[in-house]
Regions:
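Generic secondary-structure signature for well-ordered alpha-helical cores
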Residues: 3-10, 43-47, 91-92, 116-124
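Glycine-/acidic-rich phosphate or pyrophosphate-binding loops and their flanking alpha/beta elements
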Residues: 6-27, 39
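Solvent-exposed alpha-helices and their adjacent loops that cap or buttress functional pockets
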Residues: 18-23, 63-66, 88
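Short coil/turn connectors at secondary-structure junctions
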Residues: 22-25, 46-48, 67-69
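Conserved beta-strand elements of the Class I
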Residues: 27-29, 72
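Generic long, charged, amphipathic alpha-helical segments
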Residues: 33-65
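Peripheral docking tails and interdomain loops at the edges
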Residues: 71-133
Length: 133
């Protein structure tokens, strides 16, 4: 199983493993279905970047992109599994976990409000989105 991961890392081009859509002092990391909402949210935010992961193990390649940033993960799960993986594999601290686990998609309003709160220093370390409950 681990050999498959190594083979994927070697054979999948870097541009197909992750995409940095915009850099910023606040860097959001996401995976899967959060992409569309987060890309749209960037239009409403300054100083916020987005790194979209398409392969769950683009490590250690992304580590330099995380240097000196306020790191935020946005996820559709309870515990913030992507944040755990990023921290484990890059040794970089994820400062904020934005999570939603009620089965509803993250809305543009929720994403913008959460990321503004992070940028302004008002966000808790774990922010649970609840719209649509």
């Amino acid at each position: 199983r681990m050999q498959k991961l190594q083979t994927a890392r070697e054979e999948i081009p870097k541009e197909d493993q992750y995409t940095l859509y915009r850099d910023g002092e606040v860097l959001v990391l996401g995976f899967g279905s959060v992409k569309g909402t987060l890309l749209e949210a960037l239009d409403h935010l300054e100083g916020v970047g987005y790194l979209h992961l398409r392969l769950l193990w683009p490590f250690p390649e992304i580590a330099p992109l995380l240097e000196g940033k306020t790191l935020v993960t946005v996820e559709h799960n309870y515990s913030g599994q992507l944040a755990d993986l990023v921290q484990q594999e890059t040794l970089k601290r994820v400062h904020h976990r934005v999570v939603k686990y009620n089965g509803r998609p993250i809305t543009l309003d929720e994403a913008v409000a959460a990321l503004k709160a992070v940028k302004e220093g008002r966000a808790p370390k774990r922010l649970v989105l609840r719209k649509g409950v």
